[in-house]
Amino acid sequence: MTPFNNEKYIRIQSEHIKERIAQFGNKLYLELGGKLFDDYHASRVLPGFQPDSKLTMLTQLRDTMEIVIVISAADIEKNKVRQDLGITYDVDVLRLREEFMNRGFLVNSVVITHYSGQASAQNYSQRLERLGIKTYFHYTIEGYPHNVALIDSADGFGKNDYIETTRPLVVVTAPGPGSGKMAVCLSQLYNEHQRGNQAGYAKFETFPVWNLPLKHPVNKAYEAATADLNDVNMIDPYHLEAYGKTAVSYNRDSEIFPVLDALFTGIYGHNPYKSPTDMGVNMVGFCIEDDAACQEASKQEIIRRYYHALNDFANGDISEAVVNRIGRLFQQVGISTADRKTTTAANERKERNSAMAVAAIELHDGTIITAESSPLLGSSAALLLNATKYLAGIDHDVKLIPQEMIEPIQHTKISYLRGRNPRLHTDEVLVALSVLSLHDENCRKTLEALPELAGCQVHSTVMLSEVDRKIFRKLGIELTCDPVRK
């Protein structure tokens, strides 16, 4: 049994969405918060939740739904990158569309939001049109979301393109937060109403989990994940007032609810929801079967997020306030960086050997393996060799890649490719192992052990190169680094 019951989730979540569609006369715009697939955050804090669980769940509704993908013109303009995949949002829109269509979902359109005539957005729209993808523009509305009189008018939502949809359920998704998904849904409600069509709105967000305690580590891990957005979990005051029951929401939903109340009243003549919690359809909290395991997984996620923030701050990508925001969560859930075993192991070896670059990995059986840089190998490359040798049952002292093979590679890197670091990176070590595996049984065994590294934890005492980061990401390894440059 896993801590999270994924089968139960898929069943009861799809049933609940069907009920909400029926509530609004068989037309529902469902704003999807977070990721529809590749939801690795959810799979880390809720062990047993699969990265594509939400997509699998929606497969139950596939014949009655279509997907609209949203991207902000501002994100196109600044080439915003999805950090977990290392690709820009505009590229991810095409990836998402292809993934959805490969799974049999209908994807008819892309909406470019926050549009105010940006040339980059126009060029992107033309590119999509050449690919046969219908594109719509939704414009920047002055005073949004608080200028309700303007928003709920022909000069507000009324000037947005009306998205042609054909199915009862319209799922509105995006590559990342801040894309304008809610505004797209509300704009559609306004324009459907103008055309005499009945339609409803609901919000499908996994986090925060409304029926877990406010300070539950699962909910605190969500705060860590959205620290750059300044999201803060809070008790839903509207739900408490309406029902006398506590439910967890977050600041942005509570802040915007009076605006939504006015918009819904303008569109419907009344607000069908009494609270932000009412708008949601999330059933995740009913599917947790081992709360202690989910709490521990969430605490580890907060530590990882803290290290990621330290690295981003060192690179100048975020403010120190974001780092401090995550740091304050440590006291709230009772953790420290020492609770990450690989961090302790790597730093202990660093101090013991007076080494600069040390890396440590925790394998699934609890074994901790460490490695440090040498004249031949970087610490990450050495760690990969040590870990796969252990998993393959090969003695630690066995040399898999002979020095006479490494040295010519180093010579090429420095003399011909104008590199400054002669040490082999993880990708170069894997290529060398692949070549040697044709005639060396041990090399073949180490390569075959690579899939066993998925989900393992690694910590480095220095910030790694992008090459090594990508290899760890592709192997499914959870990496953290001290904010120290080599």
Residue ranges and their predicted role:
Residues 376-392:
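A short, polar/charged loop-to-alpha-helix boundary motif
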Residues 184:
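Hydrophobic positions on the alpha1 helix immediately C-terminal to the Walker A/P-loop
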Residues 1-172, 188-349, 353-356, 363-365, ...:
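Flexible phosphate-sensing "switch/lid" loops adjacent to ATP/NTP-binding sites
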Residues 399-419:
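Active-site pocket-lining segment
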Residues 395:
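Long C-terminal interaction/binding lobes of large macromolecular proteins
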Residues 176-177:
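The conserved Walker
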Residues 372-373:
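Short clusters of small/polar residues that mark proteolytic maturation junctions
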